[in-house]
Amino acid sequence: MFGIGAGVSFFVNYSHKNLPVQSSPAISTPVPAGTEYASVRELAEQMSRPGGFTSEGLVTYLQERIRTLDPQLRSVIELNPQALETARALDQERANGQVRGPLHGIPILLKDTIETQGMQTSAGAFALVGAPAGKNAPLVDYLISQGAIVLAKTNMTELAGFRGTPDGWSSRGGQTRNPHHPDADVGGSSSGSAAAVAAGLAPLAVGAETNGSIIVPAALNGVVGLKPSVGLLDRDGIIPASQHQDTPGPMARSVFDVALMLNAMSARKSHDSASVEVDYTKLLVPDALKGKRIGYPVTFTANGEVQALENSAQFSKTLEVLEAQGAVLVPINLRIADASGYEKLLLSDVKEELNGYLAKRTGLPVKSLTELIKFNEDRDGKDTDHQPDLKKINDSTLDPASRETAWNELIQDFRSTVDEPIKTHTLDAIVSDFDTNSYFGVAVAGYPGITVPSGTTEDGLPTAAHFFGTRLSEPTLLAVAHGYEQAAQAATKPEL
């Protein structure tokens, strides 16, 4: 265990038996078993009624759950040593009649790419462990201003998958496990955020995505994950990969809680934001699906050839639920855009933006991608190529002017694959089986998508439906996803 900054600790080997036990005054009302799976509204109701438990009690309860379960899951990489103190202050505010909003006193988790004052922001990499972040990312300040409590930072695929290591593994945090089965795919790169929410370690988490990093782990761990339109949420203070695709996003166990988070996360505008004042819970009402025109792919076109899609039994059931709730299902053809130049463009973006971030970030062992690669070689040796993607990124030679022109053409092509069927068939949204990997094209387009649990496989692992649409269609997507979720009731709890 190393001491970093004034009174701040982090754990190199992440040994839970060494986690500091913070003292707290006696809590009059114990937090009952099962509270770990309560919704935000249920938690707020408990904390607001006479005789209910406090936020301090809830934080204590979840900290103990982390200490008990997470040595196996390895979803949490660092506890916030100020969480209990913050909870006490928020309890006092509530007692004084001051409630900041629906997230008042609610614990949240943050992916380890999001700068958090007094805590490490390392993307799971030892090379980025040093002086704690000097301030919060604006997104974190927005959440705190609404009363949310940063409970911990979450483990992730190291460097958001750009080191070239297995999903959910980082040198700092180890291998995150899927709480539904330790050998199941956990997804990446927001692995810890999804696994921890699924395991009841916190009700809410913030993930971040370039391509699939929210949607994939949310689907595989059986929780709800929203990847917003690129630019909707503030990205300052988040370790970057590509300005063309990066976005933070909320993860929770229900669509309503995701919408509450999105309200808090978009509370203030920034130069990066395309948002307007929207209450993302407004359309989450009974009969939200009635009359909604929802497209679903029955064929796809790739390289000019039309091929049929065979629905899984699980996805066929999803369509049945949607239709039973009054949705108008429209079969569509989904064109697959040409992604042949995508990897080259993305890796070139990562090289420029990661180098720029490291150069500006103070107190870290490395200041550039070249130094990062050398750090890893010095620490882990050169006998095995344990950072193939980092080396490919560092070898990129694409010039910025050529890259921007190519990006614009690529993004427009990918956007048209979503826009065309929506316009042609006057659709409110499109739904697909998560297993079709539709999230890839949605991410390249910079468009929003949300994954919702749809049941389980024969092996008991979560399945998911993926709803997506055109730019800034989040209110409609949330409404459709909520309507499906409430009718399907398909989410399952892991047998930990």
Predicted regions span which residues?
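Sec-exported extracytoplasmic/periplasmic mature domains
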Residues: E45-G52, Q63-P71, P81-L84, R88-N96, ...
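Gly/Ser-rich catalytic/binding loops embedded in alpha/beta enzyme cores
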Residues: V31-N211, S229
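Glycine-rich, small-residue loops and helix-cap segments
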Residues: G105, S145, I149, A202, ...
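An N-terminal boundary/leader segment
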Residues: M1-T86, K317-E320, A324-A327, K374, ...
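Short helix-loop capping/hinge segments that flank enzyme active sites or metal/cofactor-binding pockets
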Residues: H104-A123, A288-T299, S348-D413, P453, ...
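Acidic-enriched catalytic cores of C-N bond-cleaving enzymes acting on peptides and small amides
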Residues: R253-V278, N303-A337, N355-F375
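A short helix-breaking turn/cap at a secondary-structure junction
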Residues: K227-A313, Q489-E495
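Flexible glycine/proline-enriched surface loops and loop-helix/loop-strand junctions
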Residues: L43, A123-A125, R177-P182, S189, ...
